């Protein structure tokens, strides 16, 4: 009640299997109203890359440069697996308290923020990312993950290069696999390329249905695989340590995990958790109203609440 009573709360929903267990909405928000899920969108990359890996079209150990010859030094020698795990050190930074952070320049290139000068394409921006100052390679020597939304766009370009079809077709199939009640909305860059790094918008109920695809270990509502069961099991078991206040979690294949559940947060106050063992999925949507739109201390209580709900009992 404390979290759903916050002034920036939008919506919360919980499902178990195909049953709606709980939902709550702010006075100015409706059950049929889509909400930006921001970086929870990244979980779609797990499903798509996992399917391509299981089909033998992607080797997680190959370098990004082997798949995308046009990529720059910031990703050329990084492996697909390291990009999935946010285990790449390069010249891209994502510090929301810094108005000049690379992430905001990335938003301008992808059409999510008004540019101050020219209008570079998202692909050109990604291609121009170089090594970190003074670095000779992209090896992450920090001991924890290095969060970069550009990583997800790189994976999206990899998926389109190896998938043999437009990325938008994958998202149409994802909407079907989730069995969305409304629609799966996704922002695109100026060239029409979907933004998996943070462009999806869903209702609270449909966000749970989206998460449940991962909770079913890749199966759609019709029982057909959209993601990959072995890839998601490896996701639960693997990953790179996250720093405090999420030190008990790992970043694994475009998800957060503690080995029991899979989840992800979104800029501005969103979080999603799905528990494959209990079949429960819970989503929390809000819009933080502070200077940067981000507060690391805001998420732990939400994560703890959703994890407890999804544990059942």
Residue positions per predicted region:
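Active-site-proximal alpha-helical segments within enzyme catalytic domains
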Residues: 150-158, 198-219, 270-287
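Active-site Gly/Thr loop motif
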Residues: 181-185, 232-284, 289
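Short, gly/Ser/Thr-rich active-site loops of penicillin-recognizing serine hydrolases
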Residues: 294-313
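Solvent-exposed loop and edge beta-strand segments that line ligand/cofactor-binding
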Residues: 138-147, 195-201, 264, 270
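Short, charged, amphipathic alpha-helices and their helix-cap/turn boundaries
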Residues: 19-22, 65, 99-140, 165-184
């Amino acid at each position: 009640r404390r979290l759903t009573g916050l002034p920036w709360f939008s919506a919360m929903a919980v499902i178990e299997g195909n049953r709606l267990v709980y939902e709550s909405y702010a006075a100015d928000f409706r059950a049929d109203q889509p909400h930006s899920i921001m970086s929870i969108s990244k979980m779609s990359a797990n499903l798509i890359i996992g399917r391509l890996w299981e089909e033998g079209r992607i080797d997680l150990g190959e370098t990004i440069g082997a798949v995308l010859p046009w990529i720059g030094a910031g990703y050329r020698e990084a492996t697909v697996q390291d990009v999935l795990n946010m285990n790449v050190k390069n010249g891209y930074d994502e510090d929301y308290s810094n108005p000049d952070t690379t992430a905001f320049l990335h938003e301008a290139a992808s059409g999510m923020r008004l540019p101050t000068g020219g209008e570079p394409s998202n692909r050109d921006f990604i291609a121009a990312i170089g090594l970190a100052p003074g670095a000779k390679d992209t090896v992450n020597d920090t001991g924890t993950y290095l969060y970069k939304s550009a990583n997800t766009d790189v994976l999206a370009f990899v998926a389109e290069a190896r998938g043999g079809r437009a990325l938008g077709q994958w998202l149409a199939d994802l909407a079907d696999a989730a069995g969305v009640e409304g629609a799966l909305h996704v922002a695109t860059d100026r060239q029409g390329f979907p933004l998996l790094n943070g462009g999806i918008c869903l209702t609270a109920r449909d966000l749970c249905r989206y998460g449940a695809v991962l909770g079913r270990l890749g199966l759609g509502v019709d029982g057909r695989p959209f993601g990959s069961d072995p890839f998601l099991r490896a996701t639960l078991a693997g990953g790179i340590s996250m720093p405090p206040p999420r030190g008990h979690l790992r970043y694994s294949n475009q998800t957060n995990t503690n080995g029991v559940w899979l989840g992800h947060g979104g800029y501005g106050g969103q979080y999603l958790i799905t528990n494959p063992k209990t079949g429960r999925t819970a989503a929390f949507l809000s819009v933080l109203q502070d200077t940067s739109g981000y507060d690391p201390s805001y998420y732990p209580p939400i994560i703890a609440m959703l994890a407890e709900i999804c544990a059942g009992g």
